[in-house]
Amino acid sequence: MAVYTKIKEDFWSIIQEMQTHIPDFVVDPNKHFLRNRKLNFETMLKMTLLLEGRSINSELDEFFDSNLTMPSASAFCQQRAKLLPDAFKYIFDKFNVQYSHSPTYQGYRLLACDGSECLFFPDKNQAEYHTSCNAYATVNSIHLNALYDLLGRRYIDAVLQPKRNKSENRAFCNMIDRLAVQEEQKVIFIADRGYEGYNQLVHIQKKHMYFLIRVKDHPKNGILTSFCYPAEPEFDSIYPLTLTRSCSIQKEYSSSRIYKRISTAHVYDYMDELDRQDYDLNLRVVRIHIGNGVYESLITNLPSASFPASKLKELYNMRWGIETSFRDLKHTIQLTDFHGKKSEFIQQEIYARLAIYNFCTVIKQAIKIEKETSKYKYEVNFQMLVKTCRRFLKEKRDDEWIRKTLEKYLLPVRPGRRYHRKNVHKGIKSFLYRN
């Protein structure tokens, strides 16, 4: 079977399989999607996956090819209210299982963790989602915590949290624990400041994995305040650390270790307060110069023989891949243009967009690009890739069509390019200003 057609059939086969146990994905299994309607279970899933940034009426007109008997926008909203967000999380997860292969870096799989805000229209009945967009406006927000494969360029897992109840550290721990890896597979988690808690580090170490996390540089408050640093601006040192809850029981302390008491107010999943158990953690702290007199500190448990400071700097720089993926997800996949106000609708669309992002990435990786004489490597323009993949999912097109279409939109990859990060005003695109 043709490669692209097989990827498409694998993607839609998930929905076919879901139809054998529909009650698992609906609000009321005794009532919902029991009758045969135009907007049945399969159609609702497919249409939600293919939503773009237009109005619901325009989306319906596109999906049903301007059929005069197509359902109304009201009917669509009523039907989607019967679906659980878990239905789209299931599609996202199952497609990841189908295409789980990922390139490695020196035999290590690189996973980046980061978070992003998804803004939608305010609702006074959803106080846990309220946040301030600016000094004059209040909006609702869901915090998207994502685990991203930097070399495979796919989202591996996601946790959605209300803005006011968000905990990036707890979400990170959940994604670490849920990660299924093959036997003897080596994984490096790469994260930015905000993920430097001891609890997360121990979760990673318990699974025999590795971490590389940027932390607050001394002398600022942070995880490094317990350590004594060398006088040099750049260094690479190992600090044997013992975590403990105890502050009163007599212990025979070792002068070669640093003892850090974990307050009972802090969550620590692997330490029983009653038994007063300790936990040993060896941290490697590396301080590097990134240019213009600016230094950054990294903590890791990677061996220095295989990963000197220069390698760690290169690895951490690769973390930027998750930042560019958020840009593509929000502005190309159109994650910012939601089609509802209810938090359940927003969660549906977030998981649906993540699934479509991964589908486009798998298609992109299957394309063989050959340039006889070229200074740069080339890749497909992501904006045109998304547009083409959506048409490919909706229409009956063959492999030759998608291959020739995408070959027209190749861009050179120029490594090492840098731009100042711009502060962009965050807002919501009103329903009144959509086509």
Task: Give names to the regions the model predicted.
Residues 1-56, 62, 76-83, 107, ...:
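Single, function-defining residue in the core of a domain
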Residues 61-68:
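The alpha-helix within a helix-turn-helix
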Residues 70-129:
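Active-site- or DNA-interface-adjacent structural scaffold in DNA-acting proteins
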Residues 130-137:
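An active-site-proximal beta-strand-loop segment
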